[in-house]
């Protein structure tokens, strides 16, 4: 599953053990294999969209109190918070689209008093020039509200949405 670890130290240890065993270890980031995500990646890479102006990525989900009754959920030792447990798939998608992050600023907190953040907002600037926001929360009332990625470019705007980014709008 994902992510490989919650800290850089743990990641180095995992890497060391994998190398020693002569094995391969791959996290599961299935958005890269989503046909619509792959299509957007192709449009970006081909230059068809022109210069990327901005993106917005929203992961607005619900994880009710029952979810947090499971002993490791919401703990700093095992969970890592909304960026690790829910939004890491979308962080990976942003890396897939735009490459390495150049700079970032963010705010977050635990609105319900957990050891980890349950809501986060970040501004990300990528070396490729793409700039945008990532908003993630598990504090939406009653049920998941939206998973949405909007890309504003010189020659088009794209929105991926739906439960599994299975809807696309292009204009």
Model-based region annotation:
Residues 85, 91-167:
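Contiguous beta-strand/loop segments that form the cofactor/metal-binding neighborhood of enzyme cores
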Residues 22-24, 53, 128-130:
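Short, well-ordered coil/turn segments that N-cap beta-strands
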Residues 1-32, 47:
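Beta-strand-loop-alpha-helix segment that lines the small-molecule cofactor/substrate pocket
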Residues 12-15, 40-43, 68-72, 118-121, ...:
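Short, glycine/charged-enriched secondary-structure capping and boundary segments
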Residues 31-113:
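Predominantly a Rossmann-like dinucleotide-binding segment in NAD(P)-dependent oxidoreductases
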Residues 7, 61-67, 142-143, 159-161:
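A short beta-to-alpha transition loop/helix N-cap that caps and shapes the active-site region
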């Amino acid at each position: 599953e994902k992510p490989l670890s919650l800290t850089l130290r743990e990641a180095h240890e995992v890497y060391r053990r994998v190398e020693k065993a002569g094995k391969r270890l791959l996290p599961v980031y299935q958005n890269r294999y989503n046909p619509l995500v792959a299509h957007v990646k192709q449009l970006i890479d081909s230059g068809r969209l022109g210069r990327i102006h901005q993106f917005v990525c929203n992961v607005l989900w619900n994880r009710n109190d029952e979810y947090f009754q499971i002993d490791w959920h919401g703990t700093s030792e095992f969970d890592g918070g909304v960026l690790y447990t829910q939004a890491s798939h979308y962080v990976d998608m942003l890396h897939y689209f735009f490459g390495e992050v150049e700079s970032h600023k963010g705010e977050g907190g635990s609105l319900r008093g957990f050891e980890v953040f349950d809501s986060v907002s970040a501004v990300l600037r990528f070396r490729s020039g793409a700039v945008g926001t990532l908003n993630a929360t598990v504090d939406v009332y009653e049920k998941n509200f939206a998973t949405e990625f909007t890309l504003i470019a010189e020659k088009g705007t794209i929105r991926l949405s739906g439960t599994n980014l299975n809807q696309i709008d292009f204009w």
